[in-house]
Amino acid sequence: MASQGTKRSYEQMETGGERQNATEIRASVGRMVGGIGRFYIQMCTELKLSDYEGRLIQNSITIERMVLSAFDERRNKYLEEHPSAGKDPKKTGGPIYRRRDGKWMRELILYDKEEIRRIWRQANNGEDATAGLTHLMIWHSNLNDATYQRTRALVRTGMDPRMCSLMQGSTLPRRSGAAGAAVKGVGTMVMELIRMIKRGINDRNFWRGENERRTRIAYERMCNILKGKFQTAAQRAMMDQVRESRNPGNAEIEDLIFLARSALILRGSVAHKSCLPACVYGLAVASGYDFEREGYSLVGIDPFRLLQNSQVFSLIRPNENPAHKSQLVWMACHSAAFEDLRVSSFIRGTRVVPRGQLSTRGVQIASNENMETMDSSTLELRSRYWAIRTRSGGNTNQQRASAGQISVQPTFSVQRNLPFERATIMAAFTGNTEGRTSDMRTEIIRMMESARPEDVSFQGRGVFELSDEKATNPIVPSFDMSNEGSYFFGDSAEEYDN
C-alpha cells in the first residue's frame, strides 16, 4: 500500500472526522450506523410495518431512498425551479410491501421531505448526519455493482466492456463525498473525467464563462482522486499531465483510457466497505445493541457478526432461485462484486457462482410487476469465515506491479494468485506510444510485461474463524492456481438504467 500517512482512514472519511484513534473511529462509525438503525425503527413505526415487513429488504430500500431523496439539496432545488407534471418537489415516497391474507400487496406511500428530514435528524441527535447518508449511498452502489452490468456506459465513453472490474461505485451520486471517492474504481473515475472532457469539447463555454474556476477545480480534484488510486510513479506522472492540461481534449481522453487499461494489471487502490441495509442496523438497535458504546468497523469482523444474527427477507419472483438472490445480496453487503469467486466462496462457505449462472433479477421490484405471484423467502447472509477488507489492489512486491486479472479488484485481504491472460490485456496496448506521455507509456507497458500471473498477492494473509474477533489465527486458503474466478464471465445481467 502506498504510504497512507497523509491520508485519513476511510472510517474517518465515512464519519467526516479529523484524525482520531482507533477507539474514537469505532465509536463514531458506531454512532453513524446506530443513527441509521434508530431512523429505520422510527420509520417502521410511522408506516405501521409488522416485524416481518420491517425485515423485508425491499421495504428497507424504499425507506433508504426516501431519506436520500429528502436530503438531495441539488435535486430538490432543481425540482422546485423546474416543476414537472405529477412530481411534488416537497414530497418523496415509494413502494411499501405488506402481507395481507397470505399475499404480498404493494402500497405507494408519499411523505413530506421535511417530515423525513425531521425523523432522520431526531434519530441522529439533531444532526444532519451526512456520513450516515453516504453510508446508505454506498450500500445502494454496492448492490448495483453486484446486480447490473455497465457495458453500455463503458462503450459510450470509448472504454472496453472487459474493463468492468474497474467500475466499482459507478452509480454513486456526485455528492457522496470523500467516503464515496474512496470506493470508486479506476474505471469509474476515468469515466467521470471523460464525460467532463467530452462536455468541454462539445460546449465551447464549458471551461470558460462564469463557472470557469469551479469547473477547473472540479476537474483537478477528480484528477487528484484518480492519481491517488494509482500505485506506480509512471501512472501518477501521467495523471499529472492530464490534470495540468490547459484545454483538455482527445489527447487526455486517450491517456485516460490507456491508464484505465493499465489498471487491469497495475491495479489501483480502491476501498471496500461492508455497508448493510438499514433494516439490519434497525434490528440490532431494536434488540438493545448499543453501537456507539460497543464500537463498529466497516472493514473488520463487525458486519459479518451482524449478518450472522440478522434475519432479512426478500420478495422472490416466480422463477427466481432464493439461494441466488441471497448470493447477490451477500456480495452487495460485503462489496464483493469484483472479488475473485474462489475467495468469496471460501469465506462464505458455499459456492459463489458467476453472474451469468444466476437465476435471479435485481432486488428491487418494478411498479408494473404483478404482486399476485410474489413470494418471499429468507436471505442467507451468513458466512463461514470473516476476512479484513482491503483498500490495495493486491499488487505484489511493494510498489511493483503484479499480475492483475481482467476481472478482479480484490475485496478481502486474503492470499491468492491473480491469474490473468497477459496476451488479452497486452493486445490492447499495441501501437500508440508517441506523444508527450510516451516515456511514461513505455514504462507502464514494461512494468505490465514483467508481471507474472503466478505471483502471490496478500502474502500470508488469511481468513479468520467467526470466534476469532481479534484476528489472531489466520487460515490461509489454498486455491486452484489455474482457475480464475470472475463474477462477470458469461454475463447476462441487465444494464443499469437510471
Swiss-Prot record:
One of its GO terms (molecular function) is structural molecule activity. GO terms for cellular component: helical viral capsid; host cell; host cell nucleus; ribonucleoprotein complex; viral nucleocapsid. Residues 1-21 are annotated as: Disordered. GO terms for biological process: symbiont entry into host cell; viral penetration into host nucleus. Late in virus-infected cells, may be cleaved from a 56-kDa protein to a 53-kDa protein by a cellular caspase. This cleavage might be a marker for the onset of apoptosis in infected cells or have a specific function in virus host interaction. It is found in: Virion; Host nucleus. Its main location: virion. SUPFAM superfamilies: flu NP-like. A motif (Unconventional nuclear localization signal) lies at residues 1-18. It comes from the Viruses. Keywords: Capsid protein, Helical capsid protein, Host nucleus, Host-virus interaction, Ribonucleoprotein, RNA-binding, Viral nucleoprotein, Viral penetration into host nucleus, Virion, Virus entry into host cell. Coiled coil: none annotated. A motif (Bipartite nuclear localization signal) lies at residues 198-216. Belongs to the influenza viruses nucleoprotein family. Encapsidates the negative strand viral RNA, protecting it from nucleases. The encapsidated genomic RNA is termed the ribonucleoprotein (RNP) and serves as template for transcription and replication. The RNP needs to be localized in the host nucleus to start an infectious cycle, but is too large to diffuse through the nuclear pore complex. NP comprises at least 2 nuclear localization signals that are responsible for the active RNP import into the nucleus through cellular importin alpha/beta pathway. Homomultimerizes to form the nucleocapsid. May bind host exportin-1/XPO1. Binds to viral genomic RNA. Protein-RNA contacts are mediated by a combination of electrostatic interactions between positively charged residues and the phosphate backbone and planar interactions between aromatic side chains and bases. This is Nucleoprotein. It comes from Influenza A virus (strain A/Duck/England/1/1962 H4N6).
